Amino acid sequence: MSKLGVVSWGAYIPRYRVRTEEVSRIWGDDPLRIVDMYLVDEKSVEGIDEDAVTIAVEAARRAIRRGGIDPRKIGAVYVGTESKPYAVKPISSILIDALGLTNNVFAVDMEFACKAGSDGLVAAIGLVEAGRVEYGMTVGTDTSQGEPGEHLEYSASSGGVALIVGKDGVAAELEAMYAFVSDTPDFWRREGSPYPMHGEGFTGEPAYFRHVIGAAKGLMEKYGYKPSDFTYVVFHQPNGRFPVRAASMLNIPLDKVKPGIVVTHIGNTYNASALMGFAKVLDIAKPGDKILLVPFGSGAGSNAFVFTVTDVVKDRQKMGVPTVEEMLQDKILVDYAQYLKMRKMIKLFE
């Protein structure tokens, strides 16, 4: 029986960073209190010529290069984002031409807050498993924004991750997946509103923890896994505290979670958040390692996946594609004024 799973991965993090203390300086907040509250030292900021599309293209190109895959063999492209440059125009169709795919591709932009990219992973897995396409790709990409002066501004950031699914040359074999979803009003943005709103008390227990724990625990109970079975565990990372607490609630040792933590250095990249942690782990994983991946999306829902790393990962790690750790270290600090300019938050005229 052929394997099914992640054949290749690629990530992109913009080089620019704004530090938490710089944002807090502008708004008169205590930087030590803010850093302690969110465990976010700095966050990534897209360049003046970057958006969710360019970030997706770069992440996808890196995934294709790492896997040595003929892009014409990719038969499905899914994009998960909350940051579409166009209100009505898909990113997925742009990727088809930018990446050199054929026109006979299933292409869809997906929406479910920060877990839409992982929903694309589910869809790609289904098409590949059914034999409808040879390879499927999902991309989680965002240039997330928070209202200036509001606490979401300390974490909302930019980045993208692409995963290619197939049966040939699998680097991380899929073993199981599970979902937990409910109608929970923890986070939303109405049509025409420039910035999202969040339901304060709904964001923790009723939303993130209920769904992340529900998906992870449900998967483990259904398929007979124990915390000790996993080498690495990666959760969605809206801040630095939530994934650590989720691990504690599941009796998962912190040393299994820390290698996949990226939020401290780049903030919450939304659809790329959990996938970025997953990519970071794949950059260092060894054959036989088992990974539990649990993305989360407000509204609310969580997907859970278990992958086992294969011998192929060693070749993928040698392809000269930038690692997540390398991108975390390759940075240029900007001040708050530059940050506003890059994020196009200064309106010169309407």
Swiss-Prot record:
A single GO molecular function term of this UniProt record: acetyl-CoA C-acetyltransferase activity
Coiled coil: none
Keyword Iron attributed: no
UniProt binding sites for (3S)-3-hydroxy-3-methylglutaryl-CoA: D30, C114, S155, T203, H236, R245, N268, S298
UniProt keyword Acyltransferase present: yes
GO biological process, one term: farnesyl diphosphate biosynthetic process, mevalonate pathway
A Pfam family per the record: ACP_syn_III_C
InterPro entries: ACP_syn_III_C, HMG_CoA_Synthase, Thiolase-like
Active site: E82, C114, H236
Pathway the protein takes part in: Metabolic intermediate biosynthesis; (R)-mevalonate biosynthesis; (R)-mevalonate from acetyl-CoA: step 2/3
EC number(s) recorded for this UniProt protein: 2.3.3.10
Positions contributing to CoA binding: R241
Catalysed transformations (reactions): acetoacetyl-CoA + acetyl-CoA + H2O = (3S)-3-hydroxy-3-methylglutaryl-CoA + CoA + H(+)
Keywords noted in UniProt: Acyltransferase, Isoprene biosynthesis, Transferase
Function of the protein: Catalyzes the condensation of acetyl-CoA with acetoacetyl-CoA to form 3-hydroxy-3-methylglutaryl-CoA (HMG-CoA). Functions in the mevalonate (MVA) pathway leading to isopentenyl diphosphate (IPP), a key precursor for the biosynthesis of isoprenoid compounds that are building blocks of archaeal membrane lipids.
Quaternary state and interactors: Interacts with acetoacetyl-CoA thiolase that catalyzes the precedent step in the pathway and with a DUF35 protein. The acetoacetyl-CoA thiolase/HMG-CoA synthase complex channels the intermediate via a fused CoA-binding site, which allows for efficient coupling of the endergonic thiolase reaction with the exergonic HMGCS reaction.
Family note: Belongs to the thiolase-like superfamily. Archaeal HMG-CoA synthase family.
PANTHER family: 3-HYDROXY-3-METHYLGLUTARYL COENZYME A SYNTHASE, HYDROXYMETHYLGLUTARYL-COA SYNTHASE
Protein name per its UniProtKB record: Hydroxymethylglutaryl-CoA synthase
Organism (species): Pyrobaculum calidifontis (strain DSM 21063 / JCM 11548 / VA1)
